[in-house]
Swiss-Prot record:
One record GO biological process: translation
Alphabetic keyword roster: Ribonucleoprotein, Ribosomal protein, RNA-binding, rRNA-binding
InterPro entries: Ribosomal_uS4 (IPR022801), Ribosomal_uS4_bac-type (IPR005709), Ribosomal_uS4_CS (IPR018079), Ribosomal_uS4_N (IPR001912), S4_RNA-bd (IPR002942), S4_RNA-bd_sf (IPR036986)
Protein name in UniProt: Small ribosomal subunit protein uS4
Subunit description: Part of the 30S ribosomal subunit. Contacts protein S5. The interaction surface between S4 and S5 is involved in control of translational fidelity.
Family under the similarity heading: Belongs to the universal ribosomal protein uS4 family.
Function: One of the primary rRNA binding proteins, it binds directly to 16S rRNA where it nucleates assembly of the body of the 30S subunit. With S5 and S12 plays an important role in translational accuracy.
Signal peptide (UniProt feature, chain positions): none
Source organism per UniProt: Elusimicrobium minutum (strain Pei191)
NCBIfam families: PRK05327.1, rpsD_bact
Origin organism lineage: Bacteria, Pseudomonadati, Elusimicrobiota, Elusimicrobia, Elusimicrobiales
GO cellular component: small ribosomal subunit
GO molecular function, one term: rRNA binding
Length: 201
């Protein structure tokens, strides 16, 4: 299954939340639906359908392909701890996700492009793999040649650098990943237990 590149509002509407980031079109469609008394009711999903939908939501949210997500779940299952929580922590430590959490990009898709286009370094070395697993203590920065790009100034204007306690800012476009976040700190509205149940069948 290839990475989804179609209309993102359509997918976000399916899950009822802006899983790809701020979405003005989604807000407008929700308002319209709320004012439509004759809008069709959603069909009740089966247990399997609910579990599958939660996995799909997690995949779309973090921008993973089916094989990537399956492999990450297998890794989470092999590590100590609660599998669902470990899965969420592995998703959070991906380089593209941390670039997004730093505010350098407004969506994870944009963060992924920054990484693949060689704008990002880890401990001073360019890393162009979005799935790179960042370790606590590593420093993520924008390359020297890219620091002058206006998009970083625009994206970081008014950004709350204290928003995520596991990311410690070093300078305007550089931060340290200080620790693995606890599940309760991860803001994504994902029921990881449903994903565990899906893969346990």
């Amino acid at each position: 299954m290839a990475r989804y590149i179609g209309p993102k509002t359509k997918i976000a509407r399916k899950f009822g939340e802006p899983i790809f980031g701020p979405d003005k079109s989604l807000i407008k469609s929700e308002r319209a639906a709320g004012n439509n008394k004759h809008a069709p009711r959603k069909k009740k999903m089966s247990v399997f359908g609910t579990q599958l939908a939660e996995k799909q939501k997690a995949k779309y949210t973090y921008g993973l392909l089916e094989k990537q997500f399956s492999n990450l779940f297998t890794k989470a299952h092999s590590l100590p701890g609660v599998t669902g929580e470990v899965l969420m922590q592995l998703l959070e430590c991906r380089l593209d996700n941390i670039v997004y959490r730093m505010g350098l990009a407004r969506t994870r898709a944009a963060a992924r492009q920054l990484v693949t286009h060689r704008h990002i370094t880890v401990d001073g070395e360019i890393v162009k793999t979005p799935s790179y697993s960042v370790k606590p203590g590593q420093v993520i920065s924008v390359t020297e040649g890219s620091k002058s790009l206006s998009m970083f100034e625009v994206n970081l204007k008014g950004y709350d650098h204290a928003k995520y306690s596991w990311i410690e800012w070093k300078e305007p476009v550089s931060a340290k990943y200080v620790r693995i976040p606890e599940r309760a700190e991860i803001p994504e509205n994902i029921n990881e237990q449903l994903i565990v149940e899906h893969y346990s069948k």
